[in-house]
């Protein structure tokens, strides 16, 4: 993601983090793009507090505005952002929420801005689920944790196919979508205005 952003963004860029969680990627991007300004939102007040803690002692933390809320918070930011990042968020949203999420992000991104999304997509066969288990274990989950994750897939995730995701993004207004990476069933997609 960093290489995509470095190649496409200018100084003084405005970046939206659409679902910032604990602020992990926000902290990384804050360091990599020292002249950028950020708006980071999450519907969880606890997650926003966790993210804010990462920046308590950082110089220039005023470059970040934190918002407790969902994409409806973006109505005040029409055409404001050069890029939006939606990392590991939409796979938790039901279909109607996914549509609203991406449409509101589209409305907040300027032209020629773009969206980078990265999410888990629908499995086509049982082997892909096994691959996901092995991947998550190689990234630090225990066998028991990865089994619990697989058992919760149907309850916690609302997965769609990569083709359906690209169509959803186009229906939201983005003109061109292409995926730039795939790891197991996690796809990174660039969607352009």
Regions found by a protein language model. Give the residues of each.
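A conserved beta-strand element that flanks and buttresses the S-adenosyl-L-methionine
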Residues: 85
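Short glycine-centered segments of the SAM/dcSAM-binding site in methyltransferase folds
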Residues: 14, 112-114
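Class I SAM-dependent methyltransferase SAM/SAH-binding core
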Residues: 16-17, 22-73
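C-terminal alpha-helical "lid/dimerization" subdomain adjacent to the S-adenosyl-L-methionine
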Residues: 118-172, 178
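Short catalytic micro-motifs in class I SAM-dependent methyltransferases
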Residues: 88-91
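Conserved alpha-helix/loop element of class I SAM-dependent methyltransferases that forms part
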Residues: 1-11
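A short glycine-rich, Lys/Arg-flanked "PGG" loop and its adjoining helix->strand segment in the class I
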Residues: 99-111
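Core SAM-dependent methyltransferase catalytic element
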Residues: 172-193
